[in-house]
């Protein structure tokens, strides 16, 4: 066979293979259309697959048609009912670790936000950690100067509890340098305070969209709880302050339903000071333990009824729980008046257990270091010093910070009572350490039916970071 014949033979063979390939494709398509199951059947040609992603909670409908995927995002249907939250608190013999985010340790080499004021709140299906970012990342030049409380860069964001406040899993909630958030059983409600000190605005978000606003009424740094608000049978309550941090200010409690404000009440508290309340539901009412930044080393107590009537006073216990504070032995306690004559303070919490009270406080009397919870017999109703339980959460060799309360709803636990939980913020960086930044991580503890051994679940990050040495 000469070269020309070889070329003709190879070409003819190739052409024949191409034609055969085309015929096979035609047969394949014909079989797919005519033979495989059609509408109403579970064939692989035309099917719908529902996928749920828990991190950024979205639902996808994926329609597969001839190897082509059509993705349609579906709005997540809301729950069918509001949470009740009228149950009593469960009795807690101790507090077990629920989560720890280790955000600063991870942030030395990860994309983690610079934050402060973390807090936890729960829906019927999950708990989330909320936090106020500084619009910057750890170990980055924009972290410089983040000791400042209020800036236009601060935002409220959230992650599933236990996750670090990282850029990949965080969900935007609101523009805010002060905030609160809670779930009514159907949707999340968040309140973010932002704007200039004299004309700040609180924007209410429900289901992720703005639904109402509260303008500053006293013109002096409108601010709110920095912890979970409280929803009872679809109505959500939170406390706000407007006015000086070191003398008489103005205080209001607000009530909203599905993101719309339906009531508010002025809290009359002459001679007392209320800031950064830590609130929780208990037997159909909202109980709050707050911060007196003016004079008291005992904590204000505010009990709110669904009709916005209230009782206000101070935590009766004969042990102080604010910082700075004096010696326990020199403190007498009062149910009605500030005691201790110490200015400044730190956000804290307490839980009523019948007439007893669990109260959290720093171990140090003068600085935000260490953290312990004490149970005081009759401490909710009397000036009792009888400490019946004590548990260390952070030892006094390590920094702590704010702390606050929340509860696990019965829909989540399947119990007939609300589990009391608290979180402890562990502040690192300025002003106590030689860095250019200030941020924090947190540990979360929940009430259990057993005593828990003392330990230190401290932050553990090794400072300074690379950015601090440039």
Give residue ranges: language-model regions.
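Short, low-complexity, Lys/Arg-enriched N-terminal segments of secretory-pathway carbohydrate enzymes
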Residues: 1-3
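Alpha-helical transmembrane segments in eukaryotic/viral proteins
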Residues: 8-40
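Beta-rich carbohydrate-recognition and catalytic domains
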Residues: 43-113, 117-276, 280-346, 350-401, ...
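C-terminal structured domain segments
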Residues: 405-411
């Amino acid at each position: 066979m000469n070269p020309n014949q070889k070329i003709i033979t190879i070409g003819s063979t190739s052409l024949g293979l191409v034609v055969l390939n085309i015929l096979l494709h035609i047969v394949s398509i014909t079989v797919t259309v005519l033979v495989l199951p059609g509408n109403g059947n579970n064939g692989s040609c035309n099917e719908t697959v529902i996928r749920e992603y828990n991190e950024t909670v979205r639902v996808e409908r994926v329609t597969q048609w001839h190897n082509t995927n059509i993705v349609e995002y579906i709005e997540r249907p809301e729950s069918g009912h509001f949470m009740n939250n009228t149950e009593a608190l469960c009795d807690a013999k101790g507090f077990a670790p629920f989560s720890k985010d280790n955000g600063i340790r991870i942030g030395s080499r990860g994309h983690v936000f610079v934050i402060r004021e973390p807090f936890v709140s729960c829906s019927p299906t999950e708990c989330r950690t909320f936090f106020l970012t500084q619009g910057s990342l750890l170990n980055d030049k924009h972290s410089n100067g983040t000791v400042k409380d209020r800036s236009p860069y601060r935002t409220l964001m959230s992650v599933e509890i236990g996750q670090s406040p990282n850029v990949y899993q965080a969900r935007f909630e609101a523009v805010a340098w002060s905030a609160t958030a809670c779930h009514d059983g159907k949707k999340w409600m968040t309140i973010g305070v932002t704007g200039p000190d004299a004309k700040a605005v609180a924007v209410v978000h429900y289901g992720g969209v703005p639904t109402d606003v509260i303008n500053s009424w006293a013109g002096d740094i409108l601010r709110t709880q920095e912890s979970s608000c409280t929803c009872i049978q679809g109505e959500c309550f939170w406390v706000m302050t407007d006015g000086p941090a070191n003398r008489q200010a103005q205080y209001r409690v607000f009530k909203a339903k599905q993101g719309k404000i339906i009531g508010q009440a002025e809290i009359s508290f002459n001679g007392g000071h209320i800031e950064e309340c830590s609130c929780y539901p208990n037997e159909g009412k909202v109980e709050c333990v707050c911060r007196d930044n003016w004079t008291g080393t005992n904590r204000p107590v505010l009990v709110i009824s669904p009709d916005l009537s209230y009782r206000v006073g101070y935590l009766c216990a004969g042990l102080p729980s604010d910082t700075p504070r004096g010696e326990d032995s020199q403190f007498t306690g009062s149910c009605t008046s500030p005691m201790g004559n110490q200015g400044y303070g730190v956000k804290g919490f307490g839980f009523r257990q019948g007439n007893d009270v669990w109260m959290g406080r720093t171990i140090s009397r003068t600085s935000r270091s260490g953290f312990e919870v004490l149970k005081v017999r009759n401490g909710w109703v009397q000036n009792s010093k009888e400490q019946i339980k004590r548990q260390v959460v952070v030892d006094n060799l390590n920094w702590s910070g704010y702390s606050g309360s929340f509860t696990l709803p019965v829909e989540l636990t399947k119990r007939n009572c609300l589990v009391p939980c608290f979180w402890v913020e562990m502040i690192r960086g300025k002003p106590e350490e030689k860095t250019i930044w200030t941020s924090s991580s947190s540990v979360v503890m929940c009430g259990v039916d057993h005593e828990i051994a003392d330990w230190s679940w401290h932050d553990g990050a090794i400072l300074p970071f690379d950015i601090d040495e440039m």
